Amino acid sequence: MLVLLCATMASQAIAAPVITFYRKQGESYVDCRITMKNGTTNFKHSSNSCSNDDDYYFSISGAEDGVQFGIYNNPDCKENESFATYKTGKGDSNRNIRITAVDASRGLPAGHLIHDTLMSGGRDKSGQLHGKVSCLKVWNAPLSTEDNAAQ
């Protein structure tokens, strides 16, 4: 019985959510996609495909309940410049969270529903964030199928 349960749970393993960043023009101008694993992605000083200081919007595919993330002006995800934080639910029926302004959560209390189970993380700092995105920080992300295979 235990073997069957483990096999069933393994077959239901999830892929990590993916966040897509968009430039000023919106959905038809994708800048980059990042797998949402715990840690930070510095747009300015790393080899990822994201442009520094060019993004205005984001969307998420494969959303998972409880993943938290912040979008920062500071390239090291420090809170000394403008930033906004979020927490995800499972998204719509297809586990997607539609296109959202990078600063949509600012000024909202923690847990405030923005749309599609996307909530405010309750922490932010004022100042221009749209067109100034330099870092993504993710925490509370579940282990994906790839992470489990590496262990």
Task: List the predicted regions and their residue ranges.
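Sec-dependent N-terminal signal peptides
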Residues: 1-9
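Compact beta-sheet-dominated domain cores in extracellular/mature segments
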Residues: 13-151
